[in-house]
């Protein structure tokens, strides 16, 4: 069977009415016209013979597939579609090239029968990326064979997921009509889906506990300040979140882009001058020549998307660049959703987004990308793994929604003390009320990701199982609300969504459960989705199918009697239809009216004229029933999609509750305490950080054989700068990081790993920990270090936390000491930020004698002969030794090298004394 003659299969990515089998066009030969198939007769039939619901059964079909082996083919010569003369190609390849010319930057998957095929450069690239066999296909008499590689249609999502993870975009070209009555004509095909890293909705292509951001940026030069001004819009179309912001300076934009970790970043074609100013090697940007970022078109598309007469209520008129970036993002979403352009009757295919929220600077604790990396908030600094990060250590959420919410909290800690305390009070209540915490967590344990599921429904991509999952979750809401009644505290505003459940959601759950069977199949185009007694026309069709099945059963008995073969079976094959199966030994004794259909190794298959005639009618009934079920399902999906905004509001509240429950679980099982949050508006010592017995939240969980050494800190109340000295590998960096992490945990409302704490709110956290060459940017280790230091000195305020681990190491000793000294003085005298500076420049201990707001601390070491033992204990006072040679010995440096180092050190010390 050739690819063009293979029966049409439902597309994985879009289920359209055109992809359904049409009872009026299929099986032209031997078709049976029956007046009983009109809707009025079917409805009457259903009233006379009402159907009773049966227990749901998940139907599974396994269809064998055959693939042609081209492993011996030579590699075709044509390596790019632009090398061929399009008019010399076969019709299929000509259409492929026409589509490829419209989507040159995307991998084009072209549906041919049971496979999605690629040709030319896409085939070569796909074969290398996915380790597929590179084959060939005849391109025409003058062309010869062209490169071809393909993937089975049923595995398309898995392969596309791999491509998306590699940052590639995919255009899906599917068959839009059935082949039964085409009589050799070329099938109608068109782009039904465009998959890009920032626009995917498929569960298998998304990280469950991480937002998938699509960002759009607009950059313009400010002629007055000679500085670049920018607008940024970012949206997660899977959850509906949509934020915009404006700013100045390319460095600030780059920090924001690095912070959100967008899967895809688009922008208008950059001017040459802007491109020269911004040559970042850390951010990949796709310039979109077709994307519209003009003010007029941005306003138009915003009004159309949200069905508004004016956009004044969105509050974006004062931020023109952000407004235009938002318009560009929506325009890109429209371009990558081609459903309406090809005539597919998918009634519900709109991506539902929240109204754009203006994300103003100053609403949250600012954490730059370098600090996020140094503190290992969401991934480790060394290898980028989730394991070993702060998020991994504290995540006790039970839902994907809660996991994403916790990540957002960590990335954007609060600076409003009342909001912080609202969260903290709820966590305290949940710590104290263990039975309530346990009951709520048990309810959330089986809660699906209704935030994303409702988005898939609104986009017309949810299947029946996903609608049932939504209903299952919505059914739990009343019980969740009952457990939250009569709380003795004042919860955040979003909490009301859980205390007072919208009754419409309960009704929606009931309607889904009433219409869909309990365990529906994956496919939504082959029937067996809708319950009995939902639709009279469907019931009438099912009644007639029952009659046909009864006829088949009687026919089997009849043919057994005629043939005298009690082992005869009447069976059905998806390709060959109904047939009578007999063993080889009895194949020669069958009745004369039997017609041989197929010969197998152990069996012969036959049909009869009556069976062939009846088969056509049964097929017609099945197709009409399947189409009816699909229409009913689409109507239900559209209904659910309409509730997406309400469902998502509830989902966000569930996510917040999940985070609070998880943090309460963390606090109760890890001996955390609730810090006293100091509001700088009400107390004079608003900059104080006083923590007793603080611990590193990640490291202490990794220790198995030893207990973590807790330490104290007092900062901001008379002391603005701590000079921390001590040996290498003694725990100075760990101490610095744990202070930063505890500050962040405090400002998300969490309890912290400490015995007791009083913490004031910070506006920013800065770190300068370690440095590496940035060869791509032409910067040495020392230049990277100085750039990071300059950034801190230019941005820090007296409300900031600054954590420095060495400055001036990449130059001569005296140069480095001079820089470290002057930086310390500037921080203590000019900025007065709360700073901890870990250093091996013991000369900096002299600063405490000259400046009243500087204090010296050291990490203790116990010496026994030549051995040293790190106690990891921080105490007042400065150290005058670094124990670098001892640390080198512990690291395994050869003994001869160690001995030589001691000799050199002794001579240098004597020379210094002299």
Curated annotation (Swiss-Prot):
Any one Gene Ontology MF annotation carried by this entry is: damaged DNA binding
Question: What InterPro entries does its record include?
Answer: DNA_mismatch_repair_MutS, DNA_mismatch_repair_MutS-lik_N, DNA_mismatch_repair_MutS/MSH, DNA_mismatch_repair_MutS_C, DNA_mismatch_repair_MutS_clamp, DNA_mismatch_repair_MutS_core, DNA_mismatch_repair_MutS_N, DNA_mismatch_repair_MutS_sf
A Gene Ontology biological process noted in the UniProt record is:
mismatch repair
Q: Which GO terms describe its cellular component?
A: cytosol
- Cystine pairs annotated here are none
Region annotation (Disordered) maps to 28-74
State where ATP binds: 726-733
Signal peptide annotation: none
Question: Tell me, what's a Pfam family for it?
Answer: MutS_IV
Which keywords does this chain's UniProt record carry?
Answer: ATP-binding, DNA damage, DNA repair, DNA-binding, Nucleotide-binding
Similarity field: Belongs to the DNA mismatch repair MutS family.
Q: What does this protein do?
A: This protein is involved in the repair of mismatches in DNA. It is possible that it carries out the mismatch recognition step. This protein has a weak ATPase activity.
The name on file for this protein is DNA mismatch repair protein MutS
Q: Which organism is the protein's source?
A: Prochlorococcus marinus (strain SARG / CCMP1375 / SS120)
């Amino acid at each position: 069977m050739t690819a063009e003659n293979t029966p049409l299969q439902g597309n994985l990515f879009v289920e359209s009415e055109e992809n359904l089998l049409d009872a009026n066009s299929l099986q032209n030969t031997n078709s049976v016209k029956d007046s009983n198939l009109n809707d009025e007769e079917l409805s009457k039939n259903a009233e006379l013979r009402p159907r009773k619901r049966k227990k749901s059964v998940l139907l599974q079909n396994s269809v064998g597939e055959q693939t042609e082996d081209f492993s011996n083919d030579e590699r075709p010569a044509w390596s790019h579609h632009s090398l061929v003369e399009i008019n010399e190609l076969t019709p299929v390849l000509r259409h492929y090239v026409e589509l490829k010319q419209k989507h040159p930057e995307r991998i084009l998957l072209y549906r041919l029968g049971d496979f999605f095929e690629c040709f030319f450069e896409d085939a070569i690239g796909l074969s290398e990326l996915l380790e597929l066999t590179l084959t060939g296909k005849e391109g025409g008499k003058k062309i010869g064979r062209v490169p071809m590689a393909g993937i089975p249609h049923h595995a398309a999502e898995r392969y596309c997921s791999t491509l998306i993870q590699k940052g590639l975009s995919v255009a899906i070209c599917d068959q839009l009509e059935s082949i039964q009555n085409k009589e050799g004509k070329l099938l109608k095909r068109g782009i039904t889906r465009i998959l890009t890293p920032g626009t995917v909705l498929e569960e298998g292509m998304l990280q469950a506990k991480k937002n998938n951001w699509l960002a759009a940026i607009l950059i313009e030069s400010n002629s007055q300040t000679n500085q670049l001004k920018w607008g940024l819009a970012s949206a997660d179309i899977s959850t509906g979140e949509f934020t915009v912001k404006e700013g100045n300076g390319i460095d600030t934009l780059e920090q924001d882009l690095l912070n959100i970790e967008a899967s895809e970043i688009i922008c208008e074609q950059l001017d040459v001058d802007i491109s020269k100013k911004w040559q970042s090697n850390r951010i990949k940007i796709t310039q979109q020549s077709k994307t519209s970022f003009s003010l007029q078109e941005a306003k138009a598309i915003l009004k159309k998307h949200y069905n508004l007469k004016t956009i004044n209520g969105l509050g974006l008129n004062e931020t023109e660049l952000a407004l235009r970036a938002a318009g560009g993002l929506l325009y890109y979403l429209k371009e990558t959703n081609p459903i309406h352009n090809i005539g597919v009757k998918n009634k519900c295919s709109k991506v539902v987004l929240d109204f754009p929220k203006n994300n103003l600077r100053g609403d949250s604790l600012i954490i730059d990308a370098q600090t996020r990396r140094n503190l290992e908030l969401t991934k480790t600094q060394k290898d980028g793994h989730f394991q070993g990060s702060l998020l991994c250590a504290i995540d006790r959420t039970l839902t994907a929604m809660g996991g994403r919410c916790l990540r957002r909290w960590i990335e954007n800690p609060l600076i409003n003390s009342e909001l912080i305390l609202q969260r903290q009070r709820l966590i305290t209540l949940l710590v104290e009320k263990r039975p309530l915490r346990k009951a709520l967590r048990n309810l959330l344990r089986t809660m699906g990701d209704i935030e994303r599921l409702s988005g898939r429904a609104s986009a017309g991509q949810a299947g029946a199982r996903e609608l049932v999952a939504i209903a299952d979750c919505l059914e739990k809401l009343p019980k969740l609300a009952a457990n939250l009644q009569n709380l003795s505290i004042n919860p955040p505003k979003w909490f009301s969504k859980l205390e007072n459940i919208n009754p419409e959601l309960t009704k929606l759950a009931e309607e889904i459960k009433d219409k869909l069977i309990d365990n529906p199949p994956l496919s939504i185009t082959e029937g067996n989705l809708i319950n009995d007694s939902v639709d009279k026309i469907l019931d009438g069709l099912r009644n007639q199918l029952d009659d046909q099945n009864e006829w088949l059963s009687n026919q089997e008995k009849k043919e057994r009697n005629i043939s005298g073969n009690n082992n005869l079976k009447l069976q059905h094959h998806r390709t060959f239809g109904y047939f009578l199966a007999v063993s080889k030994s009895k194949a020669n004794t069958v009745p004369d009216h039997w017609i041989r259909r197929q010969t197998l190794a152990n069996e012969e298959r036959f049909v009869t004229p009556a069976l062939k005639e009846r088969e056509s009618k049964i097929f017609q009934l099945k197709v009409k029933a399947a189409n009816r079920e699909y229409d009913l399902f689409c109507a239900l999906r559209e209904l659910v999609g309409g509730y997406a905004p309400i469902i998502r509001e509830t989902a966000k509240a569930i996510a917040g509750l999940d985070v609070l429950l998880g943090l309460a679980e963390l606090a109760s099982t890890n001996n955390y305490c609730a810090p006293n949050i100091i509001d700088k508006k009400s107390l004079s010592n608003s900059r104080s950080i006083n923590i007793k017995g603080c611990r590193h939240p990640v490291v202490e969980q990794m220790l198995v054989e030893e207990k973590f050494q807790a330490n104290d800190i007092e900062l901001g109340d008379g002391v603005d700068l701590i000079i921390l000295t001590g040996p290498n590998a003694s725990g100075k960096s760990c101490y610095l990081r744990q202070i930063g992490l505890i500050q962040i945990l405090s400002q998300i409302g969490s309890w912290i790993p400490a015995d007791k704490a009083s913490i004031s709110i910070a506006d920013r956290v800065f770190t300068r920990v370690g440095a590496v060459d940035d060869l791509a940017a032409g910067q040495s280790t020392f230049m990277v270090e100085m750039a990071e230091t300059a950034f801190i000195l230019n941005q820090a305020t007296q409300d900031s936390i600054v954590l420095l681990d060495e400055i001036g190491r990449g130059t001569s000793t005296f140069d480095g000491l001079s820089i470290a000294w002057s930086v310390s003085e500037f921080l203590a005298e000019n900025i007065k930020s709360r700073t901890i500076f870990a250093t091996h420049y013991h000369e900096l201990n002299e600063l405490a004698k000259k400046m009243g707001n500087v204090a010296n601390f050291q990490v203790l070491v116990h010496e026994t002969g030549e051995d040293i033992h790190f106690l990891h204990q921080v105490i007042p006072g400065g150290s005058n030794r670094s124990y670098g040679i001892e640390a080198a010995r512990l690291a395994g440096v050869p003994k001869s090298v160690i001995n030589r180092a001691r000799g050199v050190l002794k001579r240098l010390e004597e020379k210094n004394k002299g």
